[in-house]
Amino acid sequence: MQYETLNQLFFAAMETHRKPDALLVKSEGSWRPVSSQEFLEKARNLALGFHELGLKHGDRVALLSENRAEWFFIDTALQILGVVNVPIYSTLPAQQVSYIIRNSESKAVVASTASQQEKTVSIRADLSTVEHFIAIETPTPSGFEGLTLDDVTSLGTKKAESEPDLHRELASKVRPDDLATIIYTSGTTGDPKGVMLTHSNFVSNVKGTLQALPPLTTADVALSALPYAHVFERLAAHYLFPAAGITIAIAEGVDKIPENLAEIRPTVMTFAPRLYEKMHARVLENVSQASPARKRLFWWAVGVGREHGSYRLKSEAPPTFLNLKYKVATALVFKKLQQRVGGRLRFFVSGAAPLAPEIAEFFWSAGITILEGYGLTETSPVIAVNPYKGIRFGTVGQTIPEVEVKIAEDGEILTRGPNVMTGYYKNEVATREALEEDGWFHTGDVGVLSSDGYLTITDRKKDIIVTAGGKNIAPQPIENRFKANAYIAEVVLVGNQRRFASALVVPDFERLGLWAESQGLSLEDMQALVEHPKVVELLQSQVDEINADLAQFEKVKKVRLLAKEFTIDDGELTPTLKVKRNVIETRYKKLIDQMYS
């Protein structure tokens, strides 16, 4: 297929593959297929409907919605017109929604559910540029006063009867360097910045990433679960997977992933490390409850898997007897884990945050491949990914074709390529700070590049902890070690300009609860539980194990356990489940200060 714009990609993909199940959508308890033809017609009718409303090339439309099939149809319709899609996370509060709509000067707002529509009602007076409010679901709340998506579709259907080729004509006028989207970063400080990405940015990233990944075919099925407002899943599910002819099943939600994995039995899936961390924690939790004999069997299998995996990493044939042992380990232990992810998974792709190498290696030993990659919103997003034959745990792999990386004198990762954004919307100062005149983009990440091109991310440049003694500590690798522990769900390392490193730890409450019950401890008061001497002693023993492998200046000297998980709703996590470090440090300042008093 030849394509230079997202429109060319879309039409070529739909007409080349002609799938009966381009999408799979869960409805009333069963999965309903959406064919390529139905997808084409829905996108066409919406495009012409938006056109009838007066939306034209270069206008901005805000899309406030969770993942759903309509997200695909609306995004495609907007691209056909050359209209800029401004996606907004459904988890954002009304105040932040207002800022994005106002800053982008959106001409229309599409809101999915009643709760999303209510946000637009509460901020409507501030949205002077908005001419159309459009609801995906009905009934709409009081005060919404707008159209429904069905209304827009009806307008387009009528227009298609009189001008059946108009959508093709409009789509052909969109150029590769035209703006496709403005994605507002879920920044942890200040107002978010609007990242401007073109059709060419996305198309180059689709082509480069497809070359870097194992071959994908029309027989593949992907389970799609990360928010479409995030560039990682947008690139994968909306552009890359369709280009390859992959069937895309839209997960019902993050909490339904285990159930959907069993139903869909995907062959590929993209997600953030939190999924793999939780899967790993559940496995260890189940093992902890097993009989001594089952525990011995499990750890024997893991040992065999690691030895067998070391040969596979080097593309070498394992010895015959090791192969035999691995078959036994798979039959008795690993098969159950493989079945939990559907039983036919070829590989996961991990992005949006760092993945602990211990977790990637564990799944590799069990016959489940996780390809860790790296990218940012500003790079459309993929910069690098581990090759299927040549995985190196702890690295994010090698750059994809046409993308360059170099390390600046201060260790910052710089990148250049056709995937790099054109700039930040209406923010020349931030654009000049991030983009050099010769095209090099400052990622804000610190890393190391090996002689054969494997990139290792050390940390965010701004997150590096400098102790009072002048020692530099990169928190992410240490935090990843903590999160690989079965009793620890989340951790934030602190210690900037302090004498030593300390940590705020969120326990894995499910695992901790089982242990506490076995010790006769009450679970009614979580604050009392995390302060109980037995619990403190248990977690301290886990910290001591982690500290044993750290340099003296990196050792975590003090720990405080938190009584609740970090959540998106409380503003502590981004929509891709990354911790907002500054929010945590501000919220728990008294607790942090106590560790140094």
Residue map of PLM features:
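Structural core segment of the AMP-binding/adenylate-forming
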Residues: 10-11, 53, 80-155, 538, ...
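Conserved AMP-binding A3 loop
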Residues: 33-37, 173, 180-206
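Conserved AMP-binding/adenylation subdomain of ANL enzymes
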Residues: 203-224, 228-334, 344
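Conserved pre-ATP/AMP-binding loop-to-beta segment of ANL
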Residues: 18-21, 135, 157-184, 191, ...
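ANL superfamily adenylate-forming
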Residues: 115-176, 283-336
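Conserved AMP-binding/adenylate-forming core of the ANL superfamily
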Residues: 2, 22-76, 93-98, 148-156, ...
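Conserved C-terminal "lid"/linker of ANL adenylate-forming enzymes
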Residues: 490, 536, 540-597
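Conserved ATP-binding/catalytic segment of the ANL
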Residues: 399-467, 484
